[in-house]
Swiss-Prot record:
Bilayer-crossing regions: 8-28, 60-80, 91-111, 207-227, 305-325
Membrane topology annotation: Multi-pass membrane protein
InterPro entries, sorted: AlkB/XylM, FA_desaturase_dom
pH-dependence of activity, as noted: Optimum pH is 7.0.
Identification of the protein by name: Xylene/toluene monooxygenase hydroxylase component XylM
Gene Ontology MF term list: metal ion binding; monooxygenase activity
Disulfide bonds: none
Function of the protein: Component of a monooxygenase that catalyzes the first step in the degradation of xylenes and toluenes. XylM catalyzes the hydroxylation of the methyl side chain of xylenes and toluenes. The electrons are provided by the electron transfer component XylA. The best substrates are m-xylene and p-xylene, followed by toluene. Shows weak activity with o-xylene. In vitro, is also active with substituted compounds, such as chlorotoluenes. Cannot use benzyl alcohol.
Gene: xylM
Amino acid sequence: MDTLRYYLIPVVTACGLIGFYYGGYWVWLGAATFPALMVLDVILPKDFSARKVSPFFADLTQYLQLPLMIGLYGLLVFGVENGRIELSEPLQVAGCILSLAWLSGVPTLPVSHELMHRRHWLPRKMAQLLAMFYGDPNRDIAHVNTHHLYLDTPLDSDTPYRGQTIYSFVISATVGSVKDAIKIEAETLRRKGQSPWNLSNKTYQYVALLLALPGLVSYLGGPALGLVTIASMIIAKGIVEGFNYFQHYGLVRDLDQPILLHHAWNHMGTIVRPLGCEITNHINHHIDGYTRFYELRPEKEAPQMPSLFVCFLLGLIPPLWFALIAKPKLRDWDQRYATPGERELAMAANKKAGWPLWCESELGRVASI
């Protein structure tokens, strides 16, 4: 039964394929899975159960995603070419963009994320190709070499600071990860005695793959469809950065201290756990990044967030996100989970954000002892 949960991944993606095959207003079918899944994730109880799966069939869901995404774009081009999808209809264009964006972000990001942590070259190459669909084909470089080492510290561009909106975070995280990837690639080549300008530099692959998808779609389906692809990639990139935003928002850690159970937010929804390849069962992934997604242990005592779907929607309206989720959750984290040193970092972050210093009196008592 637990293995079957993960087949939600290809089923959701298949909804997009069916929509593009039939064309017309069916192109909205992929995007329509978002509100349906959100309702289920909100009304169903949280799921803290450990998984008992068939590793082969659980892993199969990961390897199906790349051919499914290629098929999704193939059916899009086919639908435009045979007239089933009309790009002169604004609602159909919007449906194409949102379906592509949603499915390129979820479940494609979680699958790509899982595969980039595998040790074999094949899944890692598949992860890079999957990341092309959300506009970040070199995501694995900074993710593995920066985020996993420096999370919850100022050195990690994937950790949003207190008071930061999702809109500014998408930009800062994108710029930060690209800069880190370029720097890491150059250092890697220098250690091998090669020039950073060597053609084996993955930065060239990054640029080539970014151009390849919209370029190929434009060639096969016309420039208008190329623009649809670019728009979907941009939105998908925002969805992708949202995962980091909501899983690490405002958390702090002393760089000299190890990563512990309280250093990530977890979203344990019954739907989002399998759909997200357990990426929302987050903290044990950071403690050991090579643990397979279905082997991650749910940590009921670790910091918890509401449904990730709800967080995404509230995050789009920063005042609501701050008032209803971010401030209450961070106040609880500071008071219940943070070490004394982390409370000092947290209050410095609050002061910078213009937030209340809710631990200041406690810090004063500790200092006076």
